[in-house]
Amino acid sequence: MDKKAARIRRATRARRKLQELGATRLVVHRTPRHIYAQVIAPNGSETLVAASTTEKAIIEQLKNTGNKEAAAVVGKIVAERALEKGIKSVSFDRSGFQYHGRVQALADAAREAGLQF
């Protein structure tokens, strides 16, 4: 099993448990150059809020989009957008990525901005 297949297996297991709970989830995906965050409805078919380092407004604020500072900006923005829509509590779905570095920075920034998980 290669590295990507193992990550997808971990993500699938976690998502199955979150779907059983019927929780709104904050999903994070990272690539070497960008980080993406989405708040997905409990049924899993609707994206309620999204933010990523590919957005023009976010790119203008940053020197580099593949670091912890960029992840923190995305976390803050996705939390603000979720709170505007009335979403206060979510479950964190790290998509099989280790809770470390950019994923942790995004989560911490979202918590500081008022999102609960």
UniProtKB/Swiss-Prot annotation:
Cystines in this chain: none
Gene3D superfamilies, sorted: 3.30.420.100
InterPro entries associated with the record: Ribosomal_uL18_bac-type, Ribosomal_uL18_bac/euk
Listed transmembrane segments: none
UniProt keyword ATP-binding present: no
UniProt KW RNA-binding keyword: yes
SUPFAM superfamilies on file: Translational machinery components
Subunit annotation: Part of the 50S ribosomal subunit; part of the 5S rRNA/L5/L18/L25 subcomplex. Contacts the 5S and 23S rRNAs.
HAMAP family named in the record: Ribosomal_uL18_B (MF_01337_B)
Protein name: Large ribosomal subunit protein uL18
